[in-house]
A protein has these predicted regions:
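Acidic, surface-exposed loops and disordered segments
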Residues: 4-9, 18-199
Length: 199
């Protein structure tokens, strides 16, 4: 009887483990037990979106996350343009070579930097853009970084439709929304890229 009981206990434990594991796969979590790390590892570029608006509260949180990025000497040279105007989005999508997905998005955030305030604005703004992408991921949204800087033609397109002052330079356009398809994150960890004490 004891053997049967032990066997049943073991069977139940194994079933629970399999169920847990399959639940993690369904959610797409990496299972580190650390929510911040899981979110980083789960981030992926999403280029197709549902025709559904994103709540203002979520957009505000994305912007707040962007402004929480580190910046040299705490200058915070970033500026953000939130675009929801359909004509502007479609015009930029038509003119930017790698931003065609903007036609599907209901919104985009343009991350910009004030070149008059910081020579390294693009470094600080890159950190801000990454925070925005991670915030989107954490809230079940999909987003993708499409570069404007350092390409003069792309920067000019963004400048044209958003009326940026001369000293405000667009780093990237981030279209975002609720994902239309289920994307999987890429496994990017590569031990060969790690060096200790010297290359």
């Amino acid at each position: 009887m004891k053997k049967i009981f032990s066997f049943l206990c073991m069977l139940m434990a194994m079933t629970a483990m399999i169920s847990c594991s399959s639940s993690k796969e369904e959610k797409g979590t990496t299972g580190t037990g650390n929510a911040a790390l899981d979110n980083i590892f789960e981030r992926k570029s999403v280029r197709t979106y549902l025709n559904k608006g994103v709540e203002k509260e979520k957009i505000d949180l994305m912007l707040r996350a962007g402004m929480s990025a580190p910046s040299g000497r705490d200058v915070r040279p970033w500026e953000f343009v939130v675009v929801s105007d359909r004509a502007k989005l479609d015009s930029m999508a038509a003119a930017l070579p790698y931003a065609k997905m903007v036609t599907q998005a209901r919104n985009a955030i343009i991350v910009c930097g004030d070149s008059a305030r910081s020579f390294y604005w693009y470094l600080d703004c890159s950190a801000a853009a990454q925070n925005i992408l991670l915030a989107a991921e954490s809230m079940g949204l999909g987003a993708v970084w499409t570069a404007a800087y350092p390409y003069e033609d792309r920067m000019e397109v963004v400048r044209k439709y958003t009326h940026l002052p001369e000293n405000i330079l667009p780093l990237c356009v981030i279209p975002f929304g609720y994902p239309a398809t289920k994307e999987q994150p890429k496994q990017k960890y590569d031990e060969k890229k790690i060096h200790y004490n010297q290359y």
